[in-house]
Design a protein with these regions (language model features):
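Active-site-proximal loop/turn and secondary-structure-junction residues that shape catalytic pockets
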Residues: 1-3, 94, 127-131
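Acidic/polar active-site rim loop that often engages polyanionic ligands
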Residues: 2-11, 83-85
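An alpha-helical appendage that flanks or caps ligand/catalytic pockets
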Residues: 9, 13-59, 101-169
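Well-ordered beta-strand positions
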Residues: 29, 86-87
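Short, well-ordered coil/turn segments that N-cap beta-strands
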Residues: 61-67, 84-86, 116-121
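Active-site mouth loops of central-metabolism enzymes
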Residues: 62-73, 129-132
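Hydrophobic faces of well-ordered beta-strands that scaffold small-molecule active sites
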Residues: 68-71, 88-90, 121-127
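Short, acidic/polar
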Residues: 72-80
Length: 169
């Protein structure tokens, strides 16, 4: 979401999927340097990491590199997850139809680019759950959930989910 990138994280808004892909690859290169002792030499279009001093080198992790997870909604970020990550975090606004018709094919395209398959990517995602100890709490929770869904529905980046159902406008 552009507002988060520019105003929350104070970063330039350009090519978010390409930047994320490169950030994940750079992170993997750093972990590889730590785990193998290889000289760090990552050079990309957005990031460059070529110095790993002994002071910042934690040494080999006996458990290996951590699993990488990425959330996404649109096809480009979802493809990046399929290409580079171990786990894809589906957005709570994602529907079963959108997951089957848009998300999974995008994950497959990304995985294929990296010589992987969909089975190499764990898919996880949150649900909207409404609970309460009594009717009043339940109604309050329902209203909060409705507001959250309405917010997501009004966010242009999530429009693809609505369009998948024919609810674009």
């Amino acid at each position: 979401i552009k507002a988060h990138i520019t105003r929350r994280f104070s970063m330039e808004w350009s090519k978010p999927a390409a930047r994320m892909r490169e950030m994940i690859l750079a992170t993997k290169a750093i972990w590889n340097s730590w785990n193998t002792g290889e000289k760090l030499d990552f050079r990309g279009d957005f990031y460059e990491h070529t110095l790993m001093t002994p002071f910042f080198h934690p040494g080999e992790n006996p458990y290996g590199a951590p699993r990488m997870a990425l959330a996404g909604v649109g096809p480009l970020m979802t493809e990046v997850a399929g290409e580079t990550c171990d786990v894809f975090l589906a957005h709570g606004f994602t529907t079963e139809k959108y997951l089957r018709e848009e998300t999974i094919p995008a994950l497959e395209r990304g995985a294929e680019r990296a010589g992987r398959s969909l089975s190499d990517v764990e898919i996880s995602g949150p649900l909207f759950v409404v609970t309460g100890n009594n009717e009043e709490e339940l109604e309050k929770a329902k209203q909060g959930t409705r507001q959250q869904i309405a917010f997501y529905g009004s966010t242009p980046a999530y429009r693809g989910v609505l369009e998948c159902h024919g609810w674009g406008e």
